[in-house]
Amino acid sequence: MKKIVLFLAMASLFSCKQSEEKMISTKETSSENEKIAKELFVHFNKHDWQKMANLYTENPEFKEPTSGMKPQLKSRAQIVKEYREMQSMFPDVQNSVVAVYPSGKNKVIVEFVSKGTNPDKTKFELPICTIFTIENGKITKDFSYFDNSQN
């Protein structure tokens, strides 16, 4: 009987230690993923599209209202091209991060406001929420949600 109690105590202690290690590992990963998401916005606001694109895997998956929320794979070259085109339309575009919410092991949700000047010289402010999936230090998915019907 003593052996069984001792075994159960050891098993319980071992499983608690594993859970604690897993929690620490998840927190470290979450913190690193938050840094990557925040770094993306630094490069965005500097209009350094190549550095921004380098935060993604070779062919990450994107979803956004402008594509009808249909998943699309894009190369880094496509990302750079699309953001350069956007910059030519909105040369002063900037994103202001409102909040960053880590979610689980590999997701980071970023709430932000995109601001700039339309080609007709009117100002716009567009609230956006993006869910980033980050694996092995690179963004694999970028799902953005916004309503630009008022802009």
Residue ranges and their predicted role:
Residues M1-I4, K17-Q18:
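Positively charged n-region of N-terminal signal peptides that target proteins for export
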Residues I4-L13:
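Sec-dependent N-terminal signal peptides
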Residues C16-Q50, N54, E58:
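Short, low-complexity N-terminal intrinsically disordered segments enriched in polar/charged residues
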Residues A53-S103:
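A solvent-exposed, acidic/Ser-Thr-rich amphipathic alpha-helical stretch
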Residues S88-M89, G116-E125:
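Short, cysteine-centered beta-strand-loop-beta hairpins and adjacent loop/turn segments enriched
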Residues Q94-S96, F124-T130:
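Short, surface-exposed coil-to-beta transition loops
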Residues N106-S114:
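A short hydrophobic beta-strand element
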Residues P127-N151:
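Short beta-strand edge/turn micro-motifs at domain boundaries
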